[in-house]
Amino acid sequence: MRITEEQELILGSLQCERLSSNIDNFRLVDDFYNGRNPSIVNTLQNEAYEDDANHRVAYYVVKNNSGEILFYFSLKCGLLYDEFLEGDRLLDMKAFYEHIFQLSKDPSLQGTDKDAVNAILEKARTKKGLKKLEVARALHLSLDSEELLKIFGENNKNVGITFAGVEIVHFCANEAHRDFWNQTGIQQKLGTVVFWQFIVPKILDLMEIVGCEYLFLFAADLSEDADLVNYYVDNLEFIDASEHSAATPMYDFACRFLCQETSTLQERRTSFFEHFNPDEEV
């Protein structure tokens, strides 16, 4: 069953604001508590305000109508890769781009050959990636040539493709005020509501002014039953996508990379609220 008017009023009473937009938040974060994620709480209480004010990471707090912080999350821009190149492959790619650049300045290169080389350069500049067949045609190489093998490897048809995205860096509930949410009678978890009510609209607004193909996160979940990963998959509709990788900070090496496409976010958000009370369906 879809969300009721009473439930809409409850969600409408919640406020989501940038952490540094209200000086009172500097004090209000002191009562934030989460026993399972003390390091995330420490970040909120000691680093987040300055990072938010300096636009390193955008921190948001969700409050009830009494001004108590119920939840916080943070967002920052990121980049996904079809394949993260390093070592010799990265050096080979750099040498290839230099070769193409020099070739583009060759006065003897004319017509369709020149157009093909310039097209490769433009795709490299805009990080749209290279297609093996296009490179082979432009440079008059066979698909199994040693030059292409260095760049594309054994089985890759594309290389160097990047995808614009936004990372959910922090996503944490304040257990000190959990009773507030429990007393609303809403069966959906607070984090699930925060995601669809507040985070998704921000991503949709962002998509109006910049390219953004993916929303992603690193789930710090090393448990055997993968409860956290399952929560992100079942409630927030992320997927465990091994075909993409990201520029991974050191502290995320022990985490699971999850992502979802943004192209259907609006439709899925609508569906979430249309089926807000699934247990009441006949």
Locations of regions flagged by a protein language model:
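Non-catalytic substrate-recognition and accessory regions of acyl/acetyltransferase enzymes
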Residues: 1-187, 194, 201-282
